[in-house]
A protein has these predicted regions:
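Sec-dependent bacterial lipoprotein signal peptides
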Residues: 1-15
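Ser/Thr/Pro/Gly-biased, low-complexity, turn-/loop-rich segments
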Residues: 2-3, 17-185
């Protein structure tokens, strides 16, 4: 009986030492319509009836999109719909178009980073709907030492970097940094 108590206490102590154990759960992912643009995203901007204002543009490191005739427009933190509105307003103010019709589509998202116990850690392209386990698969799969049931995800939310515990089915966002932990034994 005493041996069982001692073994139980040892198991509880060892389980409490697991990496990432004290992290809060990952907050829910924003929907596609709520997606916020950031540096590294590439957007296709279509200004109907204006070839010169149509094309693919990258959100630069300062969070802006450089457009012909308009110059640079702030994009970081905006949804694609908000950027459509901002460009439309800028076109009106510059007296370039009276009733601009602007459409925006994200063509390339910011990359994700997969670190730790995967076969090929590194930077990978994000695909909408990507889960933690899909990211591990893209990174060559889990190593034999990996904890496969959860991982740590570092994400920027409202300009603040947070780290949280994520399950295999947790959805990722562009720019996430995923760390797959090593099993203790």
């Amino acid at each position: 009986m005493r041996l069982i108590r001692v073994l139980t206490a040892v198991l509880v102590l060892v389980a409490g030492c697991a990496p990432g154990h004290g992290l809060p759960p990952l907050p829910p992912v924003a929907t596609t319509t709520g997606y916020r643009l950031g540096p590294g995203d590439v957007v296709r901007i279509i200004t109907f009836g204006e070839e010169s204002l149509t094309g693919e543009f990258r959100v630069n490191d300062s969070g802006r999109v450089a457009l012909p005739l308009l110059g640079s427009v702030r994009a970081t933190g905006l949804t694609p719909a908000q950027l459509e509105s901002a460009i439309g307003t800028a076109l009106k103010r510059a007296n370039l178009l009276r009733n601009p019709a602007v459409s925006i589509e994200v063509t390339t998202y910011r990359p994700i980073f997969v670190l730790g116990e995967v076969n090929k850690p590194g930077e990978y392209s994000y695909q909408p709907g990507m889960t933690l386990v899909a990211a591990a698969a893209v990174a060559g799969g889990f190593t034999y030492r990996a904890i496969q049931s959860y991982a740590s995800v570092m994400r920027t939310v409202n300009g603040e970097s947070i780290e949280a515990k994520a399950s295999r089915q947790s959805f990722l966002q562009p720019g996430d940094v995923v760390t797959i932990y090593e099993r203790r034994f």
